[in-house]
Curated annotation (Swiss-Prot):
All residue ranges annotated as the BPL/LPL catalytic domain in the record: 34-216
Gene name as annotated: lipB
SUPFAM superfamilies found in the cross-reference section: Class II aaRS and biotin synthetases
Additional notes on this entry: In the reaction, the free carboxyl group of octanoic acid is attached via an amide linkage to the epsilon-amino group of a specific lysine residue of lipoyl domains of lipoate-dependent enzymes.
Keywords recorded for this protein, A-Z: Acyltransferase, Cytoplasm, Transferase
Entry protein name: Octanoyltransferase
Marked site: Lowers pKa of active site Cys: K137
Naturally occurring in which organism (per UniProt): Halorhodospira halophila (strain DSM 244 / SL1) (Ectothiorhodospira halophila (strain DSM 244 / SL1))
Amino acid sequence: MPCALEHIHTRYLGEQPYEPTWTAMRTFTEERSSETRDELWLLQHPPVYTLGQAGRPEHILDTGETPVVHTDRGGQVTWHGPGQLVAYPLLDLRRWGLGVRTLVHALEQSVVSLLAAYGVPSHRREDAPGVYVDGAKVAALGIRVRRGCSYHGLSLNVCNDPAPFERIHPCGYAGLTTTRVHDLGITTPLDRLEVELGIYLLQAIDAASRASRHDRA
């Protein structure tokens, strides 16, 4: 069975514009073969609102001059910007024995584990994917699977401007509040949290893969 820490190549990409990154993810997924190494991209985006395939325009209240991009991920509307960590796992799910739901849970678990390491309890919600602390959303998810391979992923609010979330119904839920890692008393620098998130995500993929294979044995 492959080990995620050894077989998934992690790339730290800094701040990258959203649309070229989206194009690069699609191209990587379309052109990959059964031999292509999986990758994990960790980065930030300049300010942008993205609307998923299930997105409804009424959940966008007033985006001002911030661009809105209609994308092919699952989910509704969210915001990306500086101070928010984004993780895009580009995986051949068959290689890891994962389904879409299992991948979503692994992404959520990576954030739950990260926050738990700092003594902050968090939880997922079956009716609204993501990670929550005392009812406030700290991490959002949206993925796409093509030919058994995933792209898009997870965003974690760390020290970003919270105001842009007031201009939308985050993830399609009116009145949903958001929070940030730094609001939770965690002052670890962003670049260190990025590394830690990547490690916890790879560990969560490993754990989900082992559980999936055990269930089928």
